[in-house]
Amino acid sequence: INKNNPYYNENHPLGASDPYGTSKSCVEFITESYKKSFFKDRNISIVTARAGNVIGGGDYSEDRIVPDYLKALNGKKNLVLRNPEYVRPWQYVLEPLYGYLALAKRETLKKTRKLFSAWNFAPNQSDNVSVIKLIQCFQTNKIKKNKINIKIIIKKQIEKETKILRLNANKSKKILGWKNK
């Protein structure tokens, strides 16, 4: 990542030093290889879309920030933050979904198809905050005045995730007119 512009755009070289980031790169490589192998002579648009860290309805998985916060708020468990200082591009689930629909509409209406294209749908720069800052925001705005137990675990081992993750969505904003609200 460029230290002068610490936001990943669609043209950044793919690759990562952690399994999660590498899995995201693999999706891009596999999609591009399918397009080139099976669809290069056809007028079919194949794109990939990347979103920030999506939060909101429908997220029932284990170790997820919003469901875990709500469980802690209801007294069902302590809130465990693995990496409280890590910065993520948080966005509400419907924001990138709107972008995906705008992208699908554009790709459907185009007369010529680009061989392969990636798109970012990311929050505003001010929404790139640390995990602990996100929780503090929840605490400030919560309806119930329950005191929740926050148990912070800082792992002193080899880093498995990127400390600061930011996406540049200028392409989506400029070409699609999309914006995170």
Predicted regions and their residues:
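Proline-centered turn/helix-capping motifs that create local helix->coil transitions or kinks
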Residues: 1-4, 38-44, 59, 74, ...
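Catalytic helix-loop patch of NAD(P)-dependent Rossmann-fold dehydrogenases
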Residues: 1-54, 61
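Residue-level signature of the cytosolic catalytic core of signaling kinases
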Residues: 15, 23, 58-62, 127, ...
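Hydrophobic alpha-helix immediately C-terminal to the catalytic Tyr-X-X-X-Lys motif of short-chain
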Residues: 26, 30-34, 69, 134, ...
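Heptad-repeat alpha-helical coiled-coil signaling segments
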Residues: 53, 57-59, 85-89
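C-terminal substrate-binding subdomain of Rossmann-fold SDR/epimerase-dehydratase oxidoreductases
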Residues: 73-181
